[in-house]
Amino acid sequence: MRAVVQRVKRGKVTVDGQVVSEIGPGLVALVGIRQGDGERECRYLAEKLVNLRIFEDGKGKFNYSVKDVGGEILVVSNFTVYGDTRKGRRPSFTEAAPPEVAREVFERFLDILKEQEVSVKSGIFQATMEVEIINDGPVTVIVEI
């Protein structure tokens, strides 16, 4: 699994002109599922997102997690984070899990994340989404297992 994680002031997902999810301060995670990902990867990524210290203390040091600051997490499935651009001009997505497998793993990941005592919202799997992100910092990290 791979997640592009951004600290945000707010985030919103719109599908077909309808807002389906919206958060205030917290994290937006664009999550890709790789072939072979399962329970272990879901648990690792959920724990990492909730406890990742990328929120600043009073001295400007990254000492707080989204859980510590009472923030929310908006999770968006996104197979393109597994785009391999090393050859040619068109990304290859052969590492990404096929949709029927990825959907099951993504839903399990959301279930585990929702057990973590933090507000979790998500986009719609395999939908064409408009994702509005107001990045805070900007702070953007990649988490991979």
From Swiss-Prot:
A Gly-cisPro motif from one monomer fits into the active site of the other monomer to allow specific chiral rejection of L-amino acids. GO terms for molecular function: D-tyrosyl-tRNA(Tyr) deacylase activity; Gly-tRNA(Ala) deacylase activity; Ser(Gly)-tRNA(Ala) hydrolase activity; tRNA binding. An aminoacyl-tRNA editing enzyme that deacylates mischarged D-aminoacyl-tRNAs. Also deacylates mischarged glycyl-tRNA(Ala), protecting cells against glycine mischarging by AlaRS. Acts via tRNA-based rather than protein-based catalysis; rejects L-amino acids rather than detecting D-amino acids in the active site. By recycling D-aminoacyl-tRNA to D-amino acids and free tRNA molecules, this enzyme counteracts the toxicity associated with the formation of D-aminoacyl-tRNA entities in vivo and helps enforce protein L-homochirality. A motif (Gly-cisPro motif, important for rejection of L-amino acids) lies at residues 137-138. InterPro entries: Daa-tRNA_deacyls_DTD, DTD-like_sf. It catalyses: glycyl-tRNA(Ala) + H2O = tRNA(Ala) + glycine + H(+); a D-aminoacyl-tRNA + H2O = a tRNA + a D-alpha-amino acid + H(+). Belongs to the DTD family. This is D-aminoacyl-tRNA deacylase. Its main location: cytoplasm. Keywords: Cytoplasm, Hydrolase, RNA-binding, tRNA-binding. CDD domains: Dtyr_deacylase. GO terms for biological process: D-amino acid catabolic process. It is found in: Cytoplasm. NCBIfam families: D-aminoacyl-tRNA deacylase (TIGR00256). GO terms for cellular component: cytoplasm. Gene3D superfamilies: D-tyrosyl-tRNA(Tyr) deacylase (3.50.80.10). Its EC number is 3.1.1.96. Pfam families: Tyr_Deacylase (PF02580). Homodimer. The gene is dtd.
